[in-house]
Amino acid sequence: FGAKYPPDIREGGQWWRLVTAGFLHGGLIHILMNSWSFLTLGALAEEAFGASRMLVIYFCSTVFGFYLSYLGSPALSIGASAAIFGLIGAMIAISIKEPLRYGHMKRTFIGWAMFGVVYLFLNLRIDNYAHFGGLVAGFATAYLAGTPRAEGSFTERLWQFSSWACIVITAASFLKMYLWFSHSTQ
């Protein structure tokens, strides 16, 4: 439907799947686990980075995670885990970049990442490429983003614009998915 599926991305030009795959889930347990993780990490990330930066981190982690998965795995893949790992990477980055304010969290988030890596290799049905890509993208985006500046500054307006661009791209991706699906079922 909108999963990451390399043949459709490569031959069909369906690049929107790199976005939509991050919002689809394979069952109740899958969505509950990712929702719990997002509620926990999302609140911490929003507090640290602000809503605009967090949204950009989430989006970049999703897209880069599924892009790395597209390059490395032929399997069908869905789920918000690439973005969840991106938020873990973001919290590691901020704990390194601002140790006085967030350094006390570093061990916790490195522990989460290590637990995730160990679990990933024990469960062969999990998309390791997407998770690793999300972790790297979240770390890199957060390291570049830093924490919020003065309200109304050029930097803050740029992050707000970027977050709106991510929302528009996500909406356009779902529109493309809908149009593809409605056309392919006729």
Segments the model singles out, each with a brief description of its role:
Residues F1-Q186:
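A detector for small-residue-rich transmembrane helices and their helix-helix packing motifs
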